[in-house]
Amino acid sequence: MDIITLAEVAGNLSVIGYGIGTLGPGIGLGILFGKAMESTARQPEMSGKIQTIMFIGLALVEVLALIGFVAALIIR
């Protein structure tokens, strides 16, 4: 194999790795929003506090996806 083919394979593997790495944050966001809606339906008077905590959790979960993206770019 020549060097160009190896570089293409490494690039494709990093994209596949990033795709797999986004599964966790995607599932986490689904659970986060589902539980936030459930909590708001159960206690509507706490909706402001629940929303604030939800946005903090959203930021923490999205950081995982961004770290995966940066790692894919660095490895490439």
Curated annotation (Swiss-Prot):
User: Does the record bear Transmembrane in its keywords?
Assistant: yes
Positions marked as site (Reversibly protonated during proton transport):
E62
Topological category with respect to the lipid bilayer: Multi-pass membrane protein
Q: What is this protein called?
A: ATP synthase subunit c
CC per GO annotation? plasma membrane; proton-transporting ATP synthase complex; proton-transporting two-sector ATPase complex, proton-transporting domain
Subcellular location(s) per record = Cell membrane
What is the annotated role of this protein in its UniProt record? F(1)F(0) ATP synthase produces ATP from ADP in the presence of a proton or sodium gradient. F-type ATPases consist of two structural domains, F(1) containing the extramembraneous catalytic core and F(0) containing the membrane proton channel, linked together by a central stalk and a peripheral stalk. During catalysis, ATP synthesis in the catalytic domain of F(1) is coupled via a rotary mechanism of the central stalk subunits to proton translocation.
